[in-house]
Curated annotation (Swiss-Prot):
Known role: Involved in the metabolism of insect hormones; responsible for ecdysteroid C25-hydroxylase activity. May be involved in the breakdown of synthetic insecticides.
E.C. numbers: 1.14.15.-
PROSITE patterns: CYTOCHROME_P450 (PS00086)
CDD domains: CYP306A1-like
Lineage: superkingdom: Eukaryota
GN (gene name): phtm
Protein name (Swiss-Prot/TrEMBL): Cytochrome P450 306a1
Catalytic activity: 2,22,25-trideoxyecdysone + 2 reduced [adrenodoxin] + O2 + 2 H(+) = 2,22-dideoxyecdysone + 2 oxidized [adrenodoxin] + H2O
Subcellular location: Endoplasmic reticulum membrane; Microsome membrane
Alphabetized UniProt keyword annotations: Endoplasmic reticulum, Heme, Iron, Membrane, Metal-binding, Microsome, Monooxygenase, Oxidoreductase
The protein's enzyme class: oxidoreductase
Length: 574
């Protein structure tokens, strides 16, 4: 037997106390040195935010609920406060669960980077708007906002906004008709609201982004809807690959990633056909527009010549104001594109990466997905909660029944209670519960904390909106949280459904218009109920968005004529 090794038969060996000392002392010295270096760094630059320990290489990932990661982070927020840090794999992640901190962080340019996510950014390649950064992101965001405003996304009343409202209303009215048709087919008037909502809302976004709409049975449209529904779930299921890329080799993840990549390729092929057709339409429209402008120019020249000849024949004629404005009237208007794709093609510089084919394809996908995913999930939650909360629905009917069967934004927007119901839906079920992750572009000190460059910054909207201090009994659906004592709408400062800062949703106002028209017109035409004996799991399904589990609703049609309420509360037909 050696002095250093204890022989335990043929089963192995154990180091002696002396050997362990030789190994442990240098290791302890290394740990002490690392600790002192960290303390020195913290003294100079600030300490990192507090947070839980994780496992080597895995970080805190094993302790997150894969089905509801937003709830796991909510529990940590209760322990550590409005800001804490953990490791997602090897990615340092700062989680914000206080609205004031979110606004403070996201107003800074250093926080406008993209999060270091392997899967989503690998698929997107740094193009589009959601996963882009620096020049590509800035240009895409600026142009997108300008184009949306040109389509009518403004709070200012006028023809431009009215034109956008009419385009949205066509899709809303189609949805109402589909609900009516499906309810008549069912003996109990029970309808799955998802297909009608997805088709009609999707076609609104198709019209605004691509300048086209689809029939319900169009093969391309059916495929795009299926891809969107499955893709939103799969990216959530495979999300751990973002932090542990080697997991992409597991069979389940191989299948998921293959589905996403094949879906991307097929989607881009469909988009290429749409772009080509739109380009041809744009050329034809511009040609017709130029011909009309030329006719107007020739007509003005003819009128000028006739006026000149008339003056020569009668010099005593006085010069009119129209004569003075002749030069101004000769200025030709330019053709105004009718969708985002037309705007892109009209200003495209084919030599710039900002307008390359990859950027166009990914931008179109981002705008379509962002336009549909969040609004669709919000509408589904809204209808489900109103079917559960009959008190709230009755109050809405009292406000909506005196209006015509298709109320306008001008009629709906003053209804503070309707807006409060929409806001309460977005609070109680944040459809993007962890927001869109940001990336910290460089080392950054805020307050007493040091944020390492390359960190992922997460806005925990779920924790913010479910904070019992800001929203007592947060699981209770109470639209009154958004009303003042005199009934006016007022959003609490902790309410941030569209995030904040430079990367906040660029289509916020358009989303409000869409949600207001859908909710107002659907509730004006139908009474909603859950089928008898039905229980719906209100926890929802987590992916990129938080969506309701599949469910049916009972749609009972309300009178199309305007109704008023008698003093005793009875409904009276006008």
């Amino acid at each position: 037997m050696s002095a250093d090794i204890v022989d335990i038969g043929h089963t192995g060996w154990m180091p002696s106390v002396q050997s362990l000392s030789i190994l442990l002392v240098p290791g302890a010295l290394v740990l002490v040195i690392l600790y002192l270096c960290e303390r020195q760094c913290n003294d100079l630059m600030g300490a990192p935010p507090p947070g839980p320990w994780g496992l080597p290489f895995l970080g805190y990932l094993p302790f997150l609920d894969a089905r509801a990661p937003h709830k796991s982070l909510q529990k940590l927020a209760k322990r550590y406060g409005g800001i804490f840090e953990l490791k997602m794999g090897r990615v340092p992640t700062v989680v914000l669960s206080d609205a004031a901190l979110v606004r403070d962080f996201f107003r800074r340019d250093v926080m406008t980077g993209r999060a270091p996510l392997y899967l989503t950014h690998g698929i997107m390649g740094g193009f589009g708007i959601i996963c882009a950064q620096e020049d590509i992101w800035r240009h895409a965001r600026r142009e997108t906002i300008d184009w949306l405003k040109a389509l009518g996304m403004t709070r200012r009343p006028g023809e431009l906004r009215a034109r956008l409202e009419r385009r949205i209303a066509r899709g809303v009215d189609e949805c109402v008709r589909l609900f009516d048709t499906e309810a008549k087919k069912s003996c109990a008037s029970e309808v799955n609201p998802l297909p009608a909502l997805h088709h009609s809302l999707g076609n609104i976004i198709n019209d605004l982004v691509f300048g086209i709409t689809y029939k319900r049975d169009d093969p391309d449209w059916l495929y795009l809807q299926r891809l969107q529904e499955e893709g939103v779930k799969l990216i959530g299921v495979s999300g751990v690959v973002n932090f542990l890329p080697w997991l992409r080799h597991l069979p389940a993840n191989v299948r998921n990633i293959r589905f996403l990549l094949e879906g991307k390729a097929k989607t881009h092929a469909i988009y290429d056909r749409i772009v080509e057709a739109c380009g041809q339409r744009l050329k034809e429209k511009q040609k017709v527009f130029k011909e009309l402008q030329e006719q107007k120019r020739l007509q003005r020249q003819l009128e000028k010549e006739q006026l000149r000849q008339s003056k020569e024949a009668d010099p005593s004629q006085e010069q009119s104001e129209a004569d003075e404005d002749d030069e101004e009237s000769d200025e030709e208007d330019t053709y105004e594109p009718e969708c985002i794709l037309e705007h892109f093609l009209a200003v495209r510089d084919t030599d710039s990466q900002l307008y390359c084919d990859d950027q166009l394809r990914h931008l179109l996908a981002d705008l379509f997905g962002a336009g549909v995913d969040t609004s669709l999930a919000t509408l589904r939650w809204f209808l489900l909660y109103l079917a559960r909360e009959q008190r709230c629905q009755r109050r809405l009917h009292e406000l909506l029944l005196p209006l015509g069967p298709s109320p306008t934004l001008e009629e709906l927007e003053p209804l503070a209670y309707l807006r409060a119901c929409i806001s309460e839906t977005m609070r109680i079920r944040s459809v993007v519960p962890l927001g869109i992750p940001h990336g910290c572009k460089e080392n950054f000190v805020v307050g007493d904390y040091f944020i390492k460059g390359g960190s992922m910054i997460v806005c925990s909207e779920w924790a913010i909106h479910m904070d019992p201090v800001a929203f007592p009994e947060p699981e209770e659906f109470r639209p009154e949280r958004f009303l003042t004592a005199d009934g006016a709408y007022q959003a609490p400062p902790q309410f941030i459904p569209f995030s904040s800062g430079y990367r906040m949703c660029p289509g916020e106002e358009m989303a409000r218009m869409i949600l207001t028209l859908f909710t107002g017109r659907i509730l004006r035409r139908f009474h909603l109920e859950l089928p008898s004996g039905t229980e719906v799991d209100m926890a929802g399904e987590s992916g990129i968005t938080l969506t309701p589990t599949p469910h049916m609703l009972r749609f009972t049609k309300l009178p199309a004529v305007e109704m008023r309420h008698a003093p005793d509360g009875a409904v009276v037909q006008d």
